[in-house]
Amino acid sequence: MCVRLARNLFKTSDFIPCRRVILAVSGGSDSLALMFLVKEYLETLLIPPEIIAVTVDHQLRKESAREAEIVAEICRDHHIKHITVRWEGKKPKTHLAFSARIARYDLLVQEAQKQGASLIMTGHTLNDQVETYQMRCQRLQKRRGALRDEVGAMCDGGAASGFAGALRDKAGARRDEDYVRETRKNIAEKSYGVLYERGLSCIPREALLHRKVRLIRPLLGVQRQTLRNYLRLQGKTWIDDPTNEDRNFERVRVRQSLSSQKLVNIAQKINKAAWQRRQQAQNIADLILALDITVQYGRCFIVKPAPFLQKHSCFPFVVGLFAVLMGGGFYLLSNQKLSMLVQKLCLNSPEKRRFTCAGCVIEYNKEGIALWRERRNMKEALVEPDETLLWDGRYRITNHGSEAIKVGVANLEQLKSLLQNSNSNLEKPHFPSLQSLLMLSNDKGCDIPELISQAIIHKNVIIKRIMAPFDWLSSREDAALVNVVEPFFNLEVKR
């Protein structure tokens, strides 16, 4: 039974190419079962990777240090390498579970890079998956009524009236008004589904952490009780975390409300939602490829698409996606913000219009849509030698030099001076977007690496443009979408 269970959980591709695999082992039943199942499976391979069990001591409970020692003893008995890493420093008073999760994965990635491991595995189970679904579903349902009210307003024509006014002096204004109303009704109703389904796909089996290390959760289809039965058959015991019974936590309350039958029913819904998310990611990717989009010098431009592309249910999602990426946002637009974007977008208006969304300026006219970073909250910062800084949610700067680097944005005078004294071939510079580009400066002058090909004042610096919503963790379900968008932001400057 044990060997059969192990073979059903893993794919050969999970461990290719992989010299070492990090297993997150807390000592609980799920993670211990993962460790022993991986060990059994790897024994069937000709050239198995090395297992390294890593325990993250969050230092939130006095028992945590001893629990890490117990895991180390278990690993020693089974000839498995074990490492304990600790979440140091002051802990936040609010959103503790969220912060602990971020810290835990960051520590695992750091240890993976230190050990030369390209894969991390965690012991998330079907129970975790179903609990996540229930919590997200409850939150989304609270917002559903408000969003439906907004969609209803669009259907009644209220939201379209502002745009109809812009067309009142044009021939065929009535026809255009009907077109605008129908387009926005169509988009609003369908785009709601895009975000709603994305959230309910829950925990992906495979993801990418920090765009470097694979994260696989092979136990997502297995119930916790099955894993505990497996451990009992082998005579293994595990550590029970008392917080797993603390009803002050939402997850515990949800867990205790779930019956076995409910578990099975929700699992089917999750599988459907995951499939829908993959399909939607592909639909969004196909739409992006069909559109004429350029990203250059801090400005994104979407050429006005054909009417059938404007009416595509994913079109506002695409505009919102590029707004977030240009604005340096860490999260894709919520249902509410996407609905607001739908209300503001109307490419049939003959007048130039401008508004802000997700830290980004969106300007549209008869030619198309332009997006660039809004000029606010772009703070200056110092990058000390041998340090890496994520700046404005858009750039990751690594300083390999001997002096600190000042980062920020250029004022208009600095920008004009740089353009005049450089070999830049910009015929019609768009200064608002150019003023959002990363600038390096010191007492000797300033340098905008994205604009100027040769270093003026700084060397031994690596600058990479990032996509913040997908930078820390990127789900396999979104692979089609990420693969299409990434080339637009594939900027890396090494000096």
From Swiss-Prot:
Record bears the keyword Transit peptide: no
InterPro entries: Rossmann-like_a/b/a_fold, TilS/TtcA_N, tRNA_Ile_lys_synt, tRNA_Ile_lys_synt_N
SUPFAM superfamilies: Adenine nucleotide alpha hydrolases-like (SSF52402)
Single GO molecular function: tRNA(Ile)-lysidine synthase activity
Broad EC category: ligase
Source superkingdom: Bacteria
Residues that, per the record, bind ATP: 26-31
Gene Ontology BP terms: tRNA modification
Subcellular compartments: Cytoplasm
Entry EC number(s): 6.3.4.19
GO cellular component: cytoplasm
Keywords assigned by UniProt, alphabetized: ATP-binding, Cytoplasm, Ligase, Nucleotide-binding, tRNA processing
Chemical reaction(s) catalysed: cytidine(34) in tRNA(Ile2) + L-lysine + ATP = lysidine(34) in tRNA(Ile2) + AMP + diphosphate + H(+)
Keyword Ligase: yes
This protein's domain notes: The N-terminal region contains the highly conserved SGGXDS motif, predicted to be a P-loop motif involved in ATP binding.
Family: Belongs to the tRNA(Ile)-lysidine synthase family.
Physiological role: Ligates lysine onto the cytidine present at position 34 of the AUA codon-specific tRNA(Ile) that contains the anticodon CAU, in an ATP-dependent manner. Cytidine is converted to lysidine, thus changing the amino acid specificity of the tRNA from methionine to isoleucine.
Database matches in NCBIfam families: lysidine_TilS_N
This protein's name: tRNA(Ile)-lysidine synthase
Organism: Bartonella tribocorum (strain CIP 105476 / IBS 506)
Higher taxonomy: Bacteria, Pseudomonadati, Pseudomonadota, Alphaproteobacteria, Hyphomicrobiales
